Amino acid sequence: MNVTPLDELQWKSPEWIQVFGLRTENVLDYFAESPFFDKTSNNQVIKMQRQFSQLNDPNAAVNMTQNIMTLPDGKNGNLEEEFAYVDPARRQILFKYPMYMQLEEELMKLDGTEYVLSSVREPDFWVIRKQRRTNNSGVGSAKGPEIIPLQDYYIIGANIYQSPTIFKIVQSRLMSTSYHLNSTLESLYDLIEFQPSQGVHYKVPTDTSTTATAATNGNNAGGGSNKSSVRPTGGANMATVPSTTNVNMTVNTMGTGGQTIDNGTGRTGNGNMGITTEMLDKLMVTSIRSTPNYI
């Protein structure tokens, strides 16, 4: 059976939210329903103790709305001194929400793994920290307990996620960098070629616009030649002047029996028969003045 890693898991419980709602006061209770929560943590122990204490003494309640609390030795201490070991962000949460101040006071009496509300951005973002409390020297000590952070979780709306570790983040960044670097090298490899005479060199880029223009001109030229071979639909007095190239080809064919004539010397390719320039001029004038016959 494949188990999804916790850092790839997204969990939510719409049914729980529909019954109890989701706010800062009960966000830890909502988190306790998720698979991220450790049932052996101190939070679970305190939760069970509260349930039994409420059954034994229904009128038991602690007023935590004041800034002064009574210490076990009977002396009053200032909350700033009591929670001096807590970071300022969490300290503001403790002062604003008395229930978390009471939870912190109870956690101070225990050693082990615990969950605390680390950051709040109402109405839809909370950060919960998993930490280990060790060397607990008791309530009211100036030194305070030693706290080791273990893991952070964040709640966005109704979804709970486990924050990735530094190793996962660096690994993801390195894999992304390696992928893009490999793609770049493959693109560069396609731009070079090897020739025995020149060695390795870059290919000459082909101008696609020039190629497209040449192809278009070729199509237009082909279309023009096709149009010239079609008989016009106008009157009978319309005539077409044949090109010099066609006349020369005709003369060459007539005078040499299909052999080629050198236009510069006026001689055939084999030198057996020849046509003078004067004969070519007469044939040119005759062909221009004549009326062409269309096929």
Curated annotation (Swiss-Prot):
Localization: Nucleus
GO cellular component: core mediator complex; mediator complex; nucleus
Post-translational modification Phosphoserine, affected residues: 225
Any one of the GO BP annotations: positive regulation of transcription by RNA polymerase II
Main location: nucleus
A Pfam family matched in the record: Med6
Gene Ontology molecular function, alphabetical: transcription coactivator activity
InterPro entries registered for this protein in UniProt: Mediator_Med6, Mediator_Med6_fun, Mediator_Med6_sf
Further details from the record: Present with 4824 molecules/cell in log phase SD medium.
Similarity comment: Belongs to the Mediator complex subunit 6 family.
Subunit record text: Component of the Mediator complex, which is composed of at least 21 subunits that form three structurally distinct submodules. The Mediator head module contains MED6, MED8, MED11, SRB4/MED17, SRB5/MED18, ROX3/MED19, SRB2/MED20 and SRB6/MED22, the middle module contains MED1, MED4, NUT1/MED5, MED7, CSE2/MED9, NUT2/MED10, SRB7/MED21 and SOH1/MED31, and the tail module contains MED2, PGD1/MED3, RGR1/MED14, GAL11/MED15 and SIN4/MED16. The head and the middle modules interact directly with RNA polymerase II, whereas the elongated tail module interacts with gene-specific regulatory proteins.
Function: Component of the Mediator complex, a coactivator involved in the regulated transcription of nearly all RNA polymerase II-dependent genes. Mediator functions as a bridge to convey information from gene-specific regulatory proteins to the basal RNA polymerase II transcription machinery. The Mediator complex, having a compact conformation in its free form, is recruited to promoters by direct interactions with regulatory proteins and serves for the assembly of a functional preinitiation complex with RNA polymerase II and the general transcription factors.
Full protein name: Mediator of RNA polymerase II transcription subunit 6
Organism: Saccharomyces cerevisiae (strain ATCC 204508 / S288c)
